[in-house]
């Protein structure tokens, strides 16, 4: 089975210039904890609810003025939609990741895969 068979395809994005307040609002509205960050050139980072808590709330940054780009993870770990699920799951476990951005072979965002996706498919 391939990652493309189990990943979530309709992914919500946030732009790096948006505020954390805006990004957190999207997370609340869509009940998600992970947002890929993209600009006109493509995927430039990721933002999680944990990033917001540890890198913004705990140090007292203002969510209304702090930009997503200020705290996002820009060293992106990802997989491809045509990779086998077993290998990707092993990599996620080794790196202690809950979610991964999924790219197609043209380096475009194709979706997101989470540990929940594996469980939902009995993997």
Predicted regions and their residues:
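Bateman (tandem CBS) regulatory domains
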Residues: 1-11, 65-76
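Amphipathic alpha-helical segments that mediate coupling or scaffolding at interfaces
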Residues: 6, 26, 55-56, 71, ...
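A short, polar/charged loop-to-alpha-helix boundary motif
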Residues: 53-66, 118-123
């Amino acid at each position: 089975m391939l990652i493309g068979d189990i990943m979530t395809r309709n992914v919500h994005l946030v732009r790096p210039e948006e505020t954390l307040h805006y990004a957190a609002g999207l997370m609340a509205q869509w009940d998600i904890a992970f947002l890929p960050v993209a600009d006109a050139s493509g995927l430039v980072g990721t933002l999680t609810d944990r990033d917001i808590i540890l890198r913004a709330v705990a140090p007292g940054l203002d969510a209304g003025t702090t930009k997503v780009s200020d705290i996002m993870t820009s060293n992106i770990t990802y997989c491809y939609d045509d990779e086998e699920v077993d290998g990707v799951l092993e990599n996620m476990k080794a790196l202690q990741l809950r979610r991964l951005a999924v790219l197609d072979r043209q380096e475009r965002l194709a979706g997101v895969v989470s540990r929940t996706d594996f469980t939902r498919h009995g993997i």
